[in-house]
Amino acid sequence: MNKKNFIKGTTLPVALFFTIATFAPAWGLQTASAAIEVVQQQSTIKGTVVDSQGEPIIGASVLAEGTSNGTITDIDGVFRINVRLGAKLKVSFIGYTDKKVVAKNDMKVILVEDVTALEEVEIVAYGTQKKVTMTGAIASVKGEELTRVSVGSVSNVLGGQMTGLTTVQYSGEPGADAAEIFIRGKATWENSSPLIQVDGVDRESMSDIDPNEIESISILKDASATAVFGIRGANGVILITTKRGKEGKAKISFTTSASVLMPTKMVEQASSYDYARFHNQMMSGDGKSALFSDGVIQKFADGSDPIRFPNIQWADYIMKSSTLQSQHNLNISGGTDKVRYFISAGAYTQGGLFSEFDLPYNLSYQYRRFNYRTNLDMDVTKTTTLSFNISGNVNNSDQPRTSQGSSGLIKNMYYATPFSSPGIIDGKLVNSSDETYSDGLKLPFTGGTGMGYYGNGFSQTSNNSLNVDVILDQKMDFLTKGLSFKVKGSYNSSFTVNKVGSGGSIATYTPVLMDDGSIAYRKFGENTDVKYSYTTGKARNWYMEASFNYNRTFGDHTVTALFLYNQQKEYYPKVYSDIPHGYVGLVGRVTYDWK
């Protein structure tokens, strides 16, 4: 078989060293160990890789098994590799079955075509293409690889799965922990992210898709692969294909997983005693008087007065040691020779790490999502297929109300002084006082507490998304063999409700030392209920496409062609909500391959 595709490679020689240590114990005496360095004799092995017809295979990989020592064949199918005689070599090339051989001089390796690999197809823009005929830079991953780890967002498991793809996770907040994806870096068109398509239709994000619904994900990386998308594909394209039913008996699958989420590492904070000593040393170094008296430092040291002179580790006080995450999915697939179906329902929950205390509303970050999907294919006639894709999700997230977000809460927690507050005592939020107590002791300052989110209210967001696709595929072999026509229509909508509880207040207290040595509290402010408000938002878009596809083989020659028209409009509740925006496109593609 004549193959003219080749890749320039680099031989990576690796020297192998073995150290043998011999120990000879006898009657309680042990001789000194002797280290002997043995260098295996290596030589340059020359060989040729050909196909079953004796034609040289250009660019075949030759790798010494168990090492990174490898090379590729040149334009004549010849390779040279530095290994020892008798070493095992693995020879491989796309479209052929891998072969393991023993290294010897002037060897000849015959690779046999892998019919399965030659017929394997890859998802590409607006269609599929045989892997063996592809020239663009495309990487893919199967759906089963995505479900090995329980994650809420598909983007969090893609990192390391495909070359050229980088993911960065900026937050661990439940419901907002999706990783940002970069394909071969990042282009600069409006600071855009990669284009995401699910079953051929643009989607805003992949973070709300259940991984159990996915058949495969393909990443289009270079210009030749993304050209048909124009400027929209400047940062790469992610093509997600969902599962579909196949003819046969119904298959029921149920998966469930539970995980324990814990902070990976928390910064250890100084105790009140250490804080006071270090602060006094700092003041002394600057030629100033110490602020913390010996009496206060002694109180910090012995912990005898934890309300007036507290020592609190804010990370331990306001954060839980762990929380739970769970993921469940039930799906059924099957069909007859006329109708095929895939039906899926999934649920995902992720708890928060912030303590909720005793308020009537939730103060912790939490996220819950329910996914559903139905993919239905019906053969209306022998040449006509009608398909329906109905999917969506309902998700809810809870957050404590703060102007600084979750990162601000963490920052305040670490900035808080360990003696600023003893926390909540008998249902009261107690703050330390910098007034002089009746025994003459006084805190020079109190600093901020880590309880900034306590009593500030909450925010609950609920989002309901619906996606409906209708596809009609008509074979037109009556005109010419290999010709087909497809029309697709899609409607997508989302509705968001944001419930906010704000405007309430929490009374705070400071300790007072009574004459009898007991502790009383001075009250500041009053407890008032939060006021509730609701805001809603909606977005919708529609998409349509019509295309002619041609795929035909003439002997050793295969020709494919695509001509497609598509149009999309998006409506958002912005300032100019009556003015939609969208695009209209014409796409053409022709491919040819020989053998």
Where are these regions (language model features)?
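Small-side-chain secondary-structure face that scaffolds active or pore-lining regions
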Residues: Y348-R369, Q399-R401, T461-N467, M476-Y583, ...
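Surface-exposed loop/turn segments flanking beta-strands in extracellular/periplasmic regions
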Residues: Y273-P310, S407-G447, K499-V530, T560, ...
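Short, small/polar-rich motifs associated with maturation and membrane association
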Residues: M1-Y372, L386-S387
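Membrane-embedded beta-strand positions of outer-membrane beta-barrel proteins
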Residues: I252-T256, I343, F388, V470, ...
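Flexible loop and strand-edge segments within Gram-negative outer membrane beta-barrel domains
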Residues: P263, I307-G346, Q350-L353, L363-T446, ...
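Surface-exposed, low-complexity/disordered Ser/Thr/Gly/Pro/Asn-rich loops and linkers
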Residues: M451-Y454
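Residues on the lipid-exposed face of transmembrane beta-strands in outer-membrane beta-barrel proteins
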Residues: G185, T242, F254, L330-T336, ...
